[in-house]
Amino acid sequence: MRRGLLLLNLGTPDNADIRAVKLYLREFLTDKRVIDLPTIPRYILVYCLILPFRSPKSAQAYQSIWTEKGSPLLYHSQNLVTKLQSALKDEYKIALGMRYGTPSITTALAELKDCHSLTILPLFPQYSSAATGSAIEKTLSYLANQEIIPSIKIIRDFYQRPEYIQAQAKIMKPYIKDNFHVLFSYHGIPERHIHKSGCDTLCPQTCTPIYDKNQACYRAQCYQTSLLLAKELQLGTHQYTTAFQSRLGKTPWIKPYTDEIFAELISKGIKNIVVSCPSFVADCLETLEEIGIRAKEQWEKLGGEQFILTPCMNDHPEWIKAIQSIVNEQF
């Protein structure tokens, strides 16, 4: 029997029309780990306030990045599976499961039902309850109802892994020029999620180094990722900035906000930036539309000149090698 490798990601609508996007957002936003309110307030918020207004706007955003091959997140993920399966040969059987949408986690686990062991790899370098935690919970809830449960290994995060850092840096390096400032833009989460992770402080600027109390702190893991990438890329502390994007609603999210950091950079005389999104392993709405289109327009309106968005790792050979190493180390 082969070992099973389950790759997990967030998901994508089936297509870019309003109906498909609304169905996707409904599944996503009613997840109690994403909007961590009691059930009734959460459903009122989602059904009455968010879905009616956000669905058309989100559909328009998806349409701006949709290709003949469909969703970039989906086809990059599928290409990753194909190339990784070729690299790992018969040692593993690999399946892709999306937390929301298709292919579902249930479908992916059904493909791996004959595997005697299962390695679960959420494709989120930094741990968060809303993404990693939700995907793992969904996976384990399905397995809990099976007659035969395989031996299980979970790779909770990999932000500190040298293979990930080196792969990310190699993809970024060709885009970095001498007179460019580097902006690391991570997906944001509400501040309250940081406190719920066990971290008892929310640092006003950068985060403290990783230690026992903040080892599951998403913000601390992001800052550590930036530090490791800067070291690999030989960037000085004045040559890069860390910020957080994609905030939703009026509650405080972790800071600094990507869309507010641009004015600060401009005020310092910075005109040219390279933006990398290290919390995303595959290009998607948040990288291609939010950063590649909207953030670039904002930068130019503020007086910025050159704006370069580096691609995510997608199905890059260095990323394939990194996953091989991370997974094989489990055995």
Swiss-Prot record:
Question: According to the UniProt entry, what is the EC number of this protein?
Answer: 4.98.1.1
Molecular function in Gene Ontology: ferrochelatase activity; metal ion binding
Pfam families per the record?
A: Ferrochelatase
> GO annotations under biological process?
heme biosynthetic process
Report whether Iron shows up as a keyword of the record: yes
Residues bound to Fe cation: H187, E286
Q: Which InterPro entries match?
A: Ferrochelatase, Ferrochelatase_C, Ferrochelatase_N
Which residues belong to the signal peptide in this entry? none
Location relative to the cell: Cytoplasm
Gene3D superfamilies per the record? Answer: 3.40.50.1400
Cellular component GO terms, alphabetical: cytoplasm
The record's comment on protein family reads: Belongs to the ferrochelatase family.
The name on file for this protein is Ferrochelatase
Originating organism: Legionella pneumophila (strain Lens)
